[in-house]
């Protein structure tokens, strides 16, 4: 049972990090890959959910993850 809770906790952490973008794909190119490119002003993409909408789900998952860690350690 404890190993299942540990596995579920790790999965939730990975899901939260992918959702918030820390493990997601970067939108910027690596520096120095193309020396002939010109610098232009790029507008941010308007796709995806806003951070206000994601805040509720992320806080819920954070508290659920914390509770699972406490149950695992007890």
From Swiss-Prot:
It holds the Pfam family CD52. Expressed on lymphohematopoietic tissues, including thymus, spleen, and bone marrow, but not in liver, kidney, and brain. Residues 26-47 are annotated as: Disordered. Residues 48-74 form a propeptide. The keyword Signal applies. GO terms for cellular component: plasma membrane; side of membrane; sperm midpiece. A lipid is attached at residue 47 (GPI-anchor amidated serine). Keywords: Cell membrane, Glycoprotein, GPI-anchor, Lipoprotein, Membrane, Signal. One of its GO terms (biological process) is response to bacterium. InterPro entries: CAMPATH-1. Residues 26-42 have a biased composition (Low complexity). It is a lipid-anchor; GPI-anchor. Transmembrane segments: none annotated. Residues 1-23 form the signal peptide. Glycans are attached at residue 36. It is found in: Cell membrane. May play a role in carrying and orienting carbohydrate, as well as having a more specific role. This is CAMPATH-1 antigen. It comes from Mus musculus (Mouse). The gene is Cd52.
């Amino acid at each position: 049972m404890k190993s299942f809770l540990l596995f579920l906790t790790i999965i939730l952490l990975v899901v939260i990090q992918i959702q918030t973008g820390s493990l997601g794909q970067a939108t910027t190119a690596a520096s120095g890959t193309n020396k002939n490119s010109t610098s232009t002003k790029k507008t941010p993409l308007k796709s995806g959910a806003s951070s206000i909408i994601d805040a509720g789900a992320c806080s819920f998952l954070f508290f659920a993850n914390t509770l699972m860690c406490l149950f695992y350690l007890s």
